[in-house]
UniProtKB/Swiss-Prot annotation:
Protein name per UniProt: Asparagine synthetase [glutamine-hydrolyzing]
Organism: Mus musculus
Site (Important for beta-aspartyl-AMP intermediate formation): E365
Modified residues (Phosphothreonine): T545
Binding residues annotated for L-glutamine, in chain numbering: R49, L50, A51, V52, V53, N75, G76, E77, D97
Native organism taxonomy: Eukaryota, Metazoa, Chordata, Craniata, Vertebrata
All residue ranges annotated as the Glutamine amidotransferase type-2 domain in the record: 2-191
Catalysed reactions, as listed in the record: L-aspartate + L-glutamine + ATP + H2O = L-asparagine + L-glutamate + AMP + diphosphate + H(+)
Encoding gene (name): Asns
Pathway: Amino-acid biosynthesis; L-asparagine biosynthesis; L-asparagine from L-aspartate (L-Gln route): step 1/1
CDD domains: Asn_synthase_B_C, AsnB
Length: 561
C-alpha cells in the first residue's frame, strides 16, 4: 500500500502543486519522492512509500536501465510477478513486483499487460518514447485511484481525492475530481507541451470472466462439473491459493478478526498457511468492540481455537463519536452504512499501528457481495435476481466496502489484503449455477459454510454463526451502534434543519438526521464534492429505511431463536 500522485501539463508552479501530494502522506509513512519528467517542466510524479517488498530498491517512480523511456508509479501487489518473470525470462533490475508491468508492456502493449496481472493495483505508466500515458485499476478497485482532467489537457492523478481537490489550473477555479473506474485502463496521448488528450477508455475485465493470467497460474488442477463435492473441493483449493499468494511481503502479517464467518475463515486459513511457510512469528489477530459485543466473544473463541496472538480493543460510544470527523475525512464519503462500519475499523487500525509491528493486514472484505451474505438476500425473488444483485454489489465495491477497508487502514499506514476478492476464487464462485449460491434453510452463505464444514478450521458455532454486520456486531444487541449514533445526532440536527435539507443539499438529499450530520462533516472537508457518492447503500427487496441488519425482520427472528 502506497500513495501515488502525478501531474501532466500543469500551468502552475510545480513546487506549489506538490504540496497537495502531502495530503496522502499517511499512505506511505516510510519514504517519499517527487520527480520531474525529463524534457517536460510541467510534469511530475509524487510517491509516498510503505515498504512492504524490497525495502532497498523499491522507491518510485520505477525506472530501469533497459527501458529509460518508461516511468511507472503504482500502488498494489502483483502476486504472479515471479511466475511471469520466469515464464518470459525477463531480467529484473529490482525485487519489486511492479517491475513486471514495465517488462510486459514492452513485450506486448498495455492491454496484454494489464490482463496478465494477478493482483490489486492502480498505476500511472508514462512512455516518453511513444508519447503515451496509461492509467489502470484492478477489477474490484481494491486499490484506489482518482483523476482530474481539464478540457485543455491538464491531468492530475492520485490515490485519494484529497490529493487533488486543492490543485490550481488557469482554465477552471474548480477541478472536477472523480474516481477512476475499476476494471478499466485509459490511454492518453502526451503532447509536446506536457498536456494530454484521452484516446480511449477500455473495460478489460468483468468479474464473471476467468482472468487471462489463469493460464499461467500454479493452482492445483480444478475438477470439472458442478456436483456439490466437486465444487466444494475446487473452492477450498482456490481459497487456499488466494491466501497463499498474498503472503508476499517483507513485513509482519496480521489479521482482522470479528468472529464472523468471513474474517474467521481468513484467519484460520492464514495461520495454517503461515505455519506451512515456516514463518517465525505468531499470527496477531485483532478484534474491536464495546462491552458485551457479540463480535468480541466470537473472535475470542476463534483465536483460542486456532492459536493466534489475539488483541482485543475496547472503545466506548464517546470515543466512537469523536472519531467521526477523522473517519469521514479519511473516507471521502458520507454514505451512512459506510461511515458506521468505518469507525471500528479506523480505531482498530490506529491501535495496530501504535501498538504492534504488524503492517500487512488480512481481512474478509468482499465475501458478502460475492457469496450473497447480506441478510436481505433471503428475500430475493429468484436465484437469477440474487445473482444480478451479487454482481451489482461487486461492481460497486469501490464506492462502499472496499473504500472503507482501504481508507481506514491506509489512514494509519497499513496495507490490507482481501483474499475473497481473488480473481480466480471470485470468477469461479460466480460461474456456479445461481441456485447453488442462494441462502438455504434460512442461512446465508450456505455453500461457503458447507465447503469448510469438515475441515476442522473453525468451531461449528462460528462456521454457522448468522450474519452480523460489522457496525452492529461491535456493540450489544440491546444498544446497537446505529442507535447510539441516532440518539447522538438527534441533539445535533433539529427539525428545522431537516425541513431545509433539500435546499441545502439538493443532490443526494439526506433523509435522516444521521445522514444530515455526516453530510455536514463531509461538506466541511470537501465542499461541492457530493457527487463522489452516486447513491446511498441500502438493502434491496425489503423496503428498508435503514441499512442496519438489526432493523430487518429476518435478523430479529433469528435473534429470538
Amino acid at each position: 500500500m502506497c500513495g501515488i500522485w502525478a501531474l501532466f501539463g500543469s500551468d502552475d508552479c510545480l513546487s506549489v502543486q506538490c504540496l497537495s501530494a502531502m495530503k496522502i502522506a499517511h499512505r506511505g509513512p516510510d519514504a517519499f519522492r517527487f520527480e520531474n519528467v525529463n524534457g517536460y517542466t510541467n510534469c511530475c510524479f509524487g510517491f509516498h512509500r510503505l515498504a512492504v517488498v524490497d525495502p532497498l530498491f523499491g522507491m518510485q517512480p520505477i525506472r530501469v536501465r533497459k527501458y529509460p523511456y518508461l516511468w511507472l508509479c503504482y500502488n498494489g501487489e502483483i502476486y504472479n510477478h515471479k511466475a511471469l518473470q520466469q515464464r518470459f525470462e525477463f531480467e529484473y533490475q529490482t525485487n519489486v513486483d511492479g517491475e513486471i508491468i514495465l517488462h510486459l508492456y514492452d513485450k506486448g502493449g498495455i492491454e496484454k499487460t494489464i490482463c496478465m496481472l494477478d493482483g490489486v493495483f492502480a498505476f500511472i505508466l508514462l512512455d516518453t518514447a511513444n508519447k503515451k500515458v496509461f492509467l489502470g485499476r484492478d477489477t474490484y478497485g481494491v486499490r484506489p485511484l482518482f483523476k482530474a482532467m481539464t478540457e485543455d489537457g491538464f491531468l492530475a492523478v492520485c490515490s485519494e481525492a484529497k490529493g487533488l481537490v486543492s490543485l490550481k489550473h488557469s482554465t477552471t477555479p474548480f477541478l472536477k475530481v472523480e474516481p477512476f473506474l475499476p476494471g478499466h485502463y485509459e490511454v492518453l496521448d502526451l503532447k509536446p507541451n506536457g498536456k494530454v488528450a484521452s484516446v480511449e477508455m477500455v473495460k478489460y475485465h468483468h468479474c464473471t470472466d476467468e482472468p487471462l493470467h489463469a493460464i499461467y497460474d500454479s493452482v492445483e488442477k480444478l475438477f470439472p462439473g458442478f456436483d456439490l463435492e466437486t465444487v466444494k473441493n475446487n473452492l477450498r483449493i482456490l481459497f487456499d491459493n488466494a491466501i497463499k499468494k498474498r503472503l508476499m511481503t517483507d513485513r509482519r502479517i496480521g489479521c482482522l478478526l470479528s468472529g464472523g464467518l468471513d474474517s474467521s475463515l481468513v484467519a484460520a486459513s492464514l495461520l495454517k498457511q503461515l505455519k506451512e511457510a515456516q514463518v517465525q512469528y505468531p499470527l496477531q489477530t485483532f478484534a474491536i468492540g464495546m462491552e458485551d459485543s457479540p463480535d468480541l466473544l466470537a473472535a475470542r473463541k476463534v483465536a483460542n481455537y486456532i492459536g493466534s496472538e489475539h488483541h482485543e480493543v475496547l472503545f466506548n460510544s464517546e470515543e466512537g463519536i469523536q472519531a467521526l470527523d477523522e473517519v469521514i475525512f479519511s473516507l471521502e464519503t458520507y454514505d451512512i452504512t459506510t461511515v458506521r462500519a468505518s469507525v471500528g475499523m479506523y480505531l482498530i487500525s490506529k491501535y495496530i499501528r501504535k501498538n504492534t509491528d504488524s503492517v500487512v493486514i488480512f481481512s474478509g472484505e468482499g465475501s458478502d457481495e460475492l457469496t450473497q451474505g447480506y441478510i436481505y438476500f433471503h428475500k430475493a425473488p429468484s436465484p437469477e435476481k440474487a445473482e444480478e444483485e451479487s454482481e451489482r454489489l461487486l461492481k460497486e465495491l469501490y464506492l462502499f466496502d472496499v473504500l472503507r477497508a482501504d481508507r481506514t487502514t491506509a489512514a494509519h499506514g497499513l496495507e490490507l489484503r482481501v483474499p475473497f476478492l481473488d480473481h480466480r476464487f471470485s470468477s469461479y464462485y460466480l460461474s456456479l449455477p445461481p441456485d447453488m449460491r442462494i441462502p438455504k434453510n434460512g442461512i446465508e452463505k450456505h455453500l461457503l459454510r458447507e465447503t469448510f464444514e469438515d475441515c476442522n478450521l473453525l468451531p461449528k458455532e462460528i462456521l454457522w454463526r448468522p450474519k452480523e454486520a460489522f457496525s452492529d456486531g461491535i456493540t450489544s444487541v440491546k444498544n446497537s451502534w446505529f442507535k447510539i449514533l441516532q440518539d447522538y445526532v438527534e441533539h445535533q440536527v433539529d427539525d428545522e434543519m431537516m425541513s431545509a435539507a433539500s435546499q441545502k443539499f439538493p443532490f443526494n438529499t439526506p433523509k435522516t438526521k444521521e445522514g444530515y450530520f455526516y453530510r455536514q462533516i463531509f461538506e466541511r472537508h470537501y465542499p461541492g464534492r457530493a457527487d463522489w457518492l452516486t447513491h446511498y447503500w441500502m438493502p434491496k427487496w425489503i423496503n428498508a429505511t435503514d441499512p442496519s441488519a438489526r432493523t430487518l425482520t429476518h435478523y430479529k427472528s433469528a435473534a429470538k431463536a
